[in-house]
A protein has these predicted regions:
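Beta-strand-rich domains and repeat architectures in extracellular enzymes and scaffolds
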Residues: 40-72, 88, 92-99
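Repeated scaffold domains used in trafficking and secretory/extracellular systems
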Residues: 49-53, 93-99, 133-140, 177-182
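A short helix->beta-strand "capping" segment at the edge of beta-propeller domains
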Residues: 28-47, 81
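Blade-loop segments of beta-propeller domains
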Residues: 81-117, 125-135
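Conserved beta-strand positions in repeat-built beta-propeller and related beta-rich domains
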Residues: 62-68, 105-112, 147-151
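Short loop/turn segments that connect beta-strands within beta-propeller blades
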Residues: 77-81, 119-123, 159-162
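Short coil/turn segments that connect the beta-strands within blades of beta-propeller domains
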Residues: 58-59, 102-103, 142-143
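Surface loop/turn motifs at the tips and blade-to-blade linkers of beta-strand repeat domains
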Residues: 42-47, 87-91, 127-132, 169-175
Length: 185
């Protein structure tokens, strides 16, 4: 199981895989782009948060927190760090990655083979999608929902139907890179 240590957000972007149109057009990339970060401030989180997904939009932090029986989606005020609202997730699901898509949040489940479209204004589930395998990380690249599943495969899914359009394999020196998780588009 992938553990998360600490109870505060130190920085939002620790590691990312950039999927630009240019890099997707080529079959291989010789060298990954190195990016830095700067800690601007920290925001304390609840001790029980097991952060799986994190998005910042319009002055709010949207956080999915996983664990069977206590998974939830939380909106946190970016300035004060106060919780605006929580949406508990059914106890049978382990919440995973999230991404903002228009006026909704797409949230994956780890082994539940479900993704939920959640109305961002009231945190109600408006649609659910079934998929095969595990859900780990997700982002929206402007055209597709880009999803990882803990393997070396990344799928590009239709944002309306969640159907797979195509997949790519992440490799390093010709070898598959397993455990691809968090994605930033």
């Amino acid at each position: 199981m992938r553990g998360r240590l600490g109870t505060s957000i130190v920085c939002i972007l620790v590691f990312s895989i950039s999927l630009s149109a240019e890099s997707m057009a080529s079959d291989s990339i010789d060298e990954a782009e190195e990016r830095g970060f700067k800690v601007v401030r920290t925001i304390p989180l609840e001790e029980t948060s097991f952060t799986q997904g994190l998005e910042v939009r319009n002055g709010s932090i949207f956080q999915s927190s996983g664990l069977y029986g206590s998974s939830r989606l939380t909106e946190i005020d970016l300035q004060s760090g106060n919780i605006i609202r929580n949406m508990p997730v059914n106890d049978s699901y382990f919440a995973e990655g999230i991404t903002v898509l228009d006026q909704s949040i797409i949230m994956l489940t780890w082994k539940g083979e479900q993704a939920f479209r959640i109305d961002i204004s009231n945190f109600s589930i408006v649609e659910n999608f079934s998929f095969e395998g595990e859900g780990w990380g997700i982002c929206f690249n402007g055209e597709f929902l880009v999803m990882s599943n803990g393997t070396s495969q990344i799928s590009f899914r239709d944002p309306e139907t969640f159907e797979i359009n195509h997949t790519i394999q992440v490799t390093w020196d010709g070898q598959p890179v397993p455990n691809i998780n968090e994605l930033e588009c």
